[in-house]
Design a protein with these regions (language model features):
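Patatin-like phospholipase
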Residues: 1-142
Length: 142
């Protein structure tokens, strides 16, 4: 959130909705989606850590007029980790199809072209391997 500005639309401030719900699987189920494909950017087993006191201090300073945003940021890792548990359970049950890197992901700030190319190629090749499984999932009758 610190790197993306708050945008006001008709007087209402907005930030990336991923802060509140990084992977809206519950919403997809609520509205009745039957074939759900989830594309994650983190490797299996990844869990978010709680923000440190120092980081929370920076957030409090930057967003002191947005107490709900601060609460959302403070509990983001808890919500994210519960969502990942739900996704893993649904994937295991065959109710959703999940694509995710099978290797540790690169940093959002990564600039090394070789590292980025390797990660891109990993994703491309992994999808080629999973393509048949994805089609099978999408064609499967419930």
């Amino acid at each position: 959130p610190l790197f993306s500005p708050i945008v006001n639309i008709d007087g209402t401030p907005y930030l990336d909705g991923g802060l509140a719900d990084s992977v809206p699987i519950e919403r997809a189920l609520e509205i009745g989606n039957e074939k759900i494909v989830v594309i994650l950017t983190r490797n299996p087993g990844y869990r978010k850590k709680m923000p440190s006191k120092g980081v929370m201090k920076i957030y409090r300073s930057s967003y002191k007029t947005y107490p709900n945003l601060l609460r959302t940021i403070a509990r983001r890792s808890i919500v994210y980790n519960r969502t990942m548990e739900k996704i893993e359970k649904l994937e295991e049950e065959g109710k959703i199809f999940v694509l995710r890197p099978q290797m540790k992901t690169v940093s959002r700030l990564e600039r090394n072209a070789d590292t980025l190319t390797d990660f891109y190629n990993h994703g491309y090749n992994y999808m080629k391997k999973q393509y048949h499984n994805l089609l099978e999932y999408l064609q499967k009758e419930e």
